[in-house]
Amino acid sequence: MKNAKRTLALLLALVMSLSLLAGCGNQDNTSGGATTDETPLVVGYSPFSSKFSPFFSETAYDQDVYAMTQLGLLTSDRTGAIIYKGIEGETVNYNGTDYTYYGPADLEVVENADGTVDYNFTLREDLKFSDGEPLTVDDVIFSMYVLCDPTYEGNSTLYAQPIVGMAEYRAGMTTLSKALAAAGRDNTDFTNWTEEQQTKFWDNFDKGLVPFAQEICDYVVSAGAAAETDSVAAKASQWGFTLADDATVEDFAMAIGEQYGWIFSAMEAETAGSALSDLMDADVYNDYPVMGVKTGESADSITGIKKIDDYHMTVTMTKVDAVAIYQLGISIAPMHYYGNKDLYDYDNNSFGFPKGDLSSVRAKTTQPMGAGPYKFIKFENGTVYFEANENYFQGAPKTKYVNFLECISDDDKLNGVTTGTIDITDPSMSSDTADAIATANSNGELTGDKVTTDLVNNLGYGYIGMNSVVMSVGGEPSSQASKDLRKAFGTILSVYRDVAIDSYYGERASVINYPISDTSWAAPRPSDDGYKVAFSTDVNGNDIYTSDMSAEDKYAAAKTAALGYLEAAGYTVADGKVTAAPEGAKMEYEVWIPADGKGDHPSFM
C-alpha cells in the first residue's frame, strides 16, 4: 500500500543506475567572467533539511554540508580500505597510480589473548578547529560519548559496537516519551517525572497520535484497500502493521509509537496526509523523545573508552568485529562548541554535557563547525556558503569559496550549468537528460562548449519491494504459500527488467541480481560459485531459462513458472489462467510507482 520506505522485503535489484556530473565547458560560460580567488565554486544540490550536524543529520545532502566542515578520526583510500598510518601517510596504488593518504591519527589494532581487541589511537599534535582552538583526545572522547548517550537518536550506531562497558553505561536510563508510554496513563508513581508531564503526554497522544492513526485507516479505506466495516487490524495490515484482531485505533497509535521508539519526528514517515507536528504541542513533540529519565542503576563511564594523554587513547572491544573499525571513524566535533568545557572532567566521569541531556549539541544542529577543509558561513536564501579553513591540517584548499545552491529539480540543475549560474552538479541521468545536454552543446555531444559530463557509477540500486503482510496467504506472511505468492510476482517482474532498463537508460545502467551495487567490492559476480539470476528457478527448483532463449521465450517460461508458484500458493489454475484465490489472498494487487508524479520511471513502458 505505501511507498518504498514502507516495504518489508526486498524483491530484487532492478538496476544499477549511472549518475551524471555536469560542469561548465569553459570559462566563458561561468557567471562571473574571469576566475579569481574571490569567485566561488557553485555546486547545484537537491534541497536541504537544515540538519547540518555531524550527530543528527538525516539526508545525504545535509551530510555533505557538515562533511565539508568535519575531520574524521580515520581516513580511507579509494577502495575504502582504512589508512592506519595517517600521520606519516600511506602510499597506495590504485589503477596503476600511487596515491598518498594522510589523516589526523595513527591506529594500531591489537588482538589480546583474552579475546578483546584494543584500538590504539595516536593523534597529530598540530590539529586545530576552524576557530583556532586545538583538537585533542578530549574532543574525540566527547564526540564518542554524545554518540553513545542513552538518549542519542541519530544515525550513528557506535553505541551498538561491542565496546567494553557500553551496555552498563547505557543501562538504567531511557527517554521521557518511552518511559511514559511504558508506564501507561494510569501510572501513579511520579518519582522520575511529574504528574503534569504524564497528563500532557497522554493528552497529546489522544489529540495527536490517535487521529494520526485514524487518518491512516481512513486513507486505506478511501484507496480501496479495505472496507469501512473492516477491523482496525485489517486496515493497519495494509500499512504494514500486525495487530490483534480486536485492536482499537488507540492500539494502532501505540504500535506506531513503539515502532519508532516514541520519537515523534520519526513517526512522520507513516503519515497519510497530516503532519504529526501539527497535531501535538511543540514541547511534547520535540523534547519528550530526547529528555533522559533515570530508571535504574548505570555505570558512570564506558570503561572501554580510555584516555591515555592529550594525544593518545584506546578503545577496547569485547571481540573481533570486522566492521567495528568503520564505526570508529567518527567526526571529531569540537567540545567547546557543541558541549561545555566546564562540564568536562575525564577523571571524574564528566564528558562535556550532562548524561541524558544533549540539548547543547542539538542547539548547534543548523551551524556546523569542525576541523575540516571548510568553514560553514551561513545558509541563506537556498544557498550554503563555505570559506576555506586556514587551520586545516593539510593546508587551506585552493578554492577559497564554495557555495551549495539548492535546486528543486534536475531541470534546475541542468539549466543552471548551461546558463553559467552553477559550475558543477549531479542530475539523475536519463535519455531526456542526455538529449538536453547534447542540445545545449553546439557539437551535439555530452561534452562540449556548454557542458562537460562525467558518467560515474552510482553506489546504489533500484528495487521493487513487496509488503509481506499484504501479499500473504491466510494472514501468515512467513508461510510457504505466502512466499510462493510473492515469488510468482517476482518471477514475472524480473523477466522484464532488461527491456525496461534498456529502453529507459540505454547503456547508462545495467541489471543486477543481488541487493548490492555492482560498484561494491562485495558484489557477487557471474563467475562466482552459486551465482544465480534473480527469480530464475521454478517452484521445484529447476532453472526457468536456457542460454539460447529469445526474449519472447523467456516471457513465456516466466509465465509458466509464475503459474506454478501461484498454484503452490493455493490459487486455482486452469488452462494457463488463474481463476480463484485461496482464503486470505486476492486476485488483484496494487503496484505503486513514484515516478515523480509524471511517469518518469523505467517501469512505465
Where are the regions a protein language model picked out?
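Extracellular/periplasmic solute-recognition and catalytic clefts
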Residues: Y45, I377-E390, N403-S472, Y496, ...
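Aromatic- and charge-enriched surface segment that lines or borders ligand/interaction sites
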Residues: A105-L276, T314, G416, S478-A481, ...
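Bacterial signal peptide processing site
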Residues: G25-Q27
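Short, well-ordered beta-strand elements
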Residues: D37-P47, D118-F121, V140-S143, M313-T314, ...
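Append "and occasionally in soluble cytosolic enzymes with long acidic Gly/Pro-rich linkers
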Residues: I377, Y385-E387, A481-M605
